From Swiss-Prot:
The keyword Cell membrane does not apply. It catalyses: 7-carboxy-7-deazaguanine + NH4(+) + ATP = 7-cyano-7-deazaguanine + ADP + phosphate + H2O + H(+). This is 7-cyano-7-deazaguanine synthase. GO terms for molecular function: ATP binding; ligase activity, forming carbon-nitrogen bonds; zinc ion binding. Belongs to the QueC family. It comes from the Bacteria. The gene is queC. Binds 1 zinc ion per subunit.
């Protein structure tokens, strides 16, 4: 992360991960601009949650962008109400909640928006350590997208991924480090069924979130120490 970065664009869904990234960014940068994408998602309540959180956290600006074309192109349990969310993997080894091209599109549009604003970096809450199995959450993908944006727009632009090498318990610890654990727990929306806070308790997103929270609450000191170590001496931050 460059010391010269002062203005950033956060890809902001209103969920646990992106909200934690937003909270951290507000302590590190002069201008924090959020961008939220409306793609006709199953859990589209997250858009209103993102609007509310952006106002509550007093970020520099918040833009909601209509990308409904993605809904037409990408068939997934998150873009089709008729497809139930499954706990089983598909034949290709991916969850049926995977939306093909979603992060390719989101990071491309965030890059264009960053160019327009004169921002030096994009922040996204993707994670390879403790994630849902999506290929577009991996470190190598993010680096490839960063390279494509830099070459395609002839502009220096970093994609920062603060959570890339953290597990879910450490992500909860990060929110707690900034004294925002309760806000993230009770006012974000991660649930695929659109239920704020602890969610439905049944979908894969809720299971992952709750397991991480339980791990953190049962081992606060150890997890916080591991978070500090991961930040200071862990794998290089993407």
């Amino acid at each position: 992360m460059s010391a010269s970065v002062s203005k950033v664009v956060v890809v902001f869904s209103g969920g646990q991960d992106s909200t934690t990234c937003l909270i951290q960014a507000l302590t590190q940068y002069d201008e924090v601009h959020g961008i939220t994408f409306d793609y006709g998602q199953r859990h589209r309540e997250e858009i209103d949650v993102a609007k509310s959180l952006a106002q509550r956290l007093n970020i520099t600006s918040h833009k909601v962008m209509d990308v409904s074309l993605l809904n037409e192109l990408a068939i997934s349990a998150l873009t089709r109400d008729a497809i139930p969310v499954s706990h089983e993997l598909m034949e290709n080894g991916l969850p049926n909640t995977f939306v093909p091209g979603r992060n390719i599109l989101f990071l491309t549009l965030a890059g264009i928006y960053a160019y327009q604003l004169g921002a030096e970096a994009i922040i996204t809450g993707v994670c390879e350590t403790d994630f849902s199995g999506y290929p577009d959450c991996r470190h190598d993908f993010v680096r490839a997208m960063e390279s494509a944006l830099v070459q395609g727009m002839d502009k220096k632009l970093n994609i920062i991924t603060p959570l890339m090498w953290l597990n879910k318990a450490q992500t909860w610890a990060l929110a707690d480090k900034y004294q925002q654990l309760d806000l993230v727990r009770h006012h974000t929306l991660t649930c695929y069924n659109g239920i704020v806070g602890d969610g439905c308790g049944d979908c894969p997103a809720c299971h992952l979130r709750q397991r991480g929270l339980d791990d953190y609450l049962q081992n606060k000191s150890a997890v916080m120490a591991s978070l500090t170590q991961a930040i200071e001496t862990g794998k290089p931050q993407a």
